[in-house]
């Protein structure tokens, strides 16, 4: 049986609208709200424009900007990449593919035992995080300030080794070629090899000639 002893709820009386919500005052408030909404727009109209004339005048980039990758060389032209694939393992987007190969005395591309025979970076996947350059043990891979990578062909955004290698300077020799006379791979890693050869050997030869 239903309980009929429950007290009845009090009747809610409708609250009449305030006189402040109607009439000229209400219309004036709405007008001020509309003007306030354009405050930011009106304030920006008189500020100095920040539009850049791109691509006619590209703006500067930050000092540590992560742009297109570059495979670096030693001063005599040998490649710094040793084909270790650490950059590919560190890439969270699986954008790097590396195949290493062995150097020989007849055909040497890098100072050590191995070099990167195949090197690809897929810029359709690359997120520019820079983890690959942090993983590189020889500083073979760095990132440049070049950010104009747009293309209308997807295949052209997969960069091969020839597009990633740093250009040869006039004092460099294109590999393959032997190491500097008397130099080891450690001398290259320590920066003791210049475009003319091994620094210590050249200095000792100069000292011997002066005697």
Curated annotation (Swiss-Prot):
Cofactor binding remark: Binds 2 [4Fe-4S] clusters per subunit.
Gene Ontology CC terms: plasma membrane
Keyword set, alphabetical order: 4Fe-4S, Cell membrane, Iron, Iron-sulfur, Membrane, Metal-binding, NAD, Quinone, Repeat, Translocase
GO biological process: aerobic respiration
Keyword Iron-sulfur: yes
CC cofactor: [4Fe-4S] cluster
Ranges of residues in domain 4Fe-4S ferredoxin-type: 71-101, 117-146
Subcellular location(s) of the protein: Cell membrane
Region annotation Disordered: where it falls in the sequence: 1-27
Keyword 4Fe-4S in annotation: yes
Bilayer disposition of the protein: Peripheral membrane protein
Annotated residues for binding of [4Fe-4S] cluster 1: 81, 84, 87, 136
Binding site for [4Fe-4S] cluster 2: 91, 126, 129, 132
First-tier enzyme category under EC: translocase
Pfam families with a match to the protein in the record: Fer4_7
Catalyzed reactions per annotation: a quinone + NADH + 5 H(+)(in) = a quinol + NAD(+) + 4 H(+)(out)
PROSITE patterns assigned: 4FE4S_FER_1 (PS00198), 4FE4S_FER_2 (PS51379)
Oligomeric and partner information: NDH-1 is composed of 14 different subunits. Subunits NuoA, H, J, K, L, M, N constitute the membrane sector of the complex.
Function field: NDH-1 shuttles electrons from NADH, via FMN and iron-sulfur (Fe-S) centers, to quinones in the respiratory chain. The immediate electron acceptor for the enzyme in this species is believed to be menaquinone. Couples the redox reaction to proton translocation (for every two electrons transferred, four hydrogen ions are translocated across the cytoplasmic membrane), and thus conserves the redox energy in a proton gradient.
Family: Belongs to the complex I 23 kDa subunit family.
Cited HAMAP family: NDH1_NuoI
Protein name: NADH-quinone oxidoreductase subunit I
